[in-house]
From Swiss-Prot:
Source organism superkingdom: Archaea
Subunit structure: Homotetramer.
Pathway(s) the chain acts in: Carbohydrate degradation; glycolysis; pyruvate from D-glyceraldehyde 3-phosphate: step 1/5
Single GO MF annotation: NAD binding
Protein's name in the database: Glyceraldehyde-3-phosphate dehydrogenase
Subcellular location, record wording: Cytoplasm
Main localization category: cytoplasm
Length: 341
């Protein structure tokens, strides 16, 4: 049994904690919360609560939340820490983990040089195999790697152009925006290009990113110059080999991200999450050697299977065994939405 502690219980941390808790080979030692808020209270129903340091214990107990110990205590009872703290804190936290000689997994908001490797389950699982520290790439990069890996494997990629329409913030965040604007990234390519190269062997990658006033999902418009010829049916066949890709169609009333997330809620998974990357089949076109498609990304959850697989990769568990266990436990099945042509 792999003992795992979760440092940070926000959008990603709480989902990793749940996903880890339903694995038959992972035990959640506890979670670290910094503030004794409603989320800490709810978490205490399912997990041992730890705090960053001794100074926080009384604050939590004054709010009626029992504290098991501090981060130091959690590290002593864990084989691996999943660091889901706010962006940028990982560089400080890794010093603590190294001092305690505990393995750690970081999130995509950290710089790529924070660990021994960056991680995507499909494309480079073994680069983190039995390592000490790895970083699960961001929600956008995870989505791109997941749908491009089959294409790269089967047909090769000469050139890649991606326009990323990013959600402004997550549904529970009242601090960020924009609210009534579209905000373009002024860097070209956006940081997603270099991030993608940390998990896929690609050279010519060009990305443009824009923030839109929505909280539901990201949307990517993708153009791939293939090395080898392929037909649309060939591309579909490649994607259908991978459970974490879901093929949907506009004619089934998937007109927008609103309907996709409505479908996800109806699946009755934890928190109404959609772990798979949804590709509109209607959008897939091949002209000469250029492949075009549009995909939607549930930014709150697509990296969760990756975090579970990263735990097993650091622990020396086989790639295919891990992916199969993760998919089965989270009810990830992918394929064509209605299960037939």
């Amino acid at each position: 049994m792999i003992k795992v502690g979760i440092n940070g219980y926000g959008t990603i941390g709480k989902r990793v904690a749940y996903a880890a808790s339903i694995q038959d080979d992972i035990h959640v030692s506890g979670i670290v919360k910094n503030t004794p808020d409603y989320m800490a209270y709810l978490a205490s129903r399912s997990f041992n609560i730890y705090v960053p340091d001794d100074d926080k214990i009384k604050e939590f107990e004054d709010h009626g939340i029992k504290v098991k110990g501090t981060l130091n205590d959690l590290m002593e009872s864990s084989d691996i820490i999943v660091d889901a703290t706010p962006e940028g804190m990982g560089m400080e936290n890794i010093k603590i983990y190294k001092k305690k000689r505990v393995k750690a997994i970081f999130q995509g908001g950290e710089k790529s040089n924070i660990g021994d490797a960056s991680f995507n389950a499909y494309s480079n699982y073994n680069e983190s195999f039995k390592r000490e520290y790895t970083r699960v790439v961001s929600c956008n990069t995870t989505a791109l790697a997941r749908t491009l890996y089959p294409i790269l494997n089967d047909y090769g990629i000469e050139n890649l152009n991606v326009t990323l329409i990013r959600r402004a913030t997550d549904p529970n965040d009242n601090r960020k925006g924009p609210i009534n604007a579209i905000e373009p990234s002024m860097s070209f390519p956006s940081h997603h290009a270099d991030d993608l190269k940390t998990v896929l062997n690609l050279n010519n990658v060009y990305t443009v990113a824009l923030k839109a006033p929505t909280t539901l999902m990201h949307v990517h418009s993708i153009e791939v110059l293939l090395k080898d010829d392929a037909k649309i049916d060939d591309i579909m066949e490649s994607w259908l080999k991978y459970n974490r890709i879901l093929l949907i169609e506009g004619k089934d009333n998937f007109k927008s991200t609103a309907q996709i997330m409505d479908m996800a809620r109806e699946l009755r998974r934890d928190r109404g999450d959609l772990y798979e990357i949804a590709i509109w089949r209607d959008s897939v076109k091949v002209i000469d050697k250029r492949l075009y498609y549009v995909q939607a990304v549930h930014q709150e959850s697509d990296v969760i299977p990756e975090n579970i697989d990263a735990i097993r990769s650091l622990s020396g568990i086989d790639k295919n065994e891990s992916i199969e266990k993760t998919d089965k436990s989270l009810r990830i099945s992918g394929g064509i939405f209605y299960g037939k042509e």
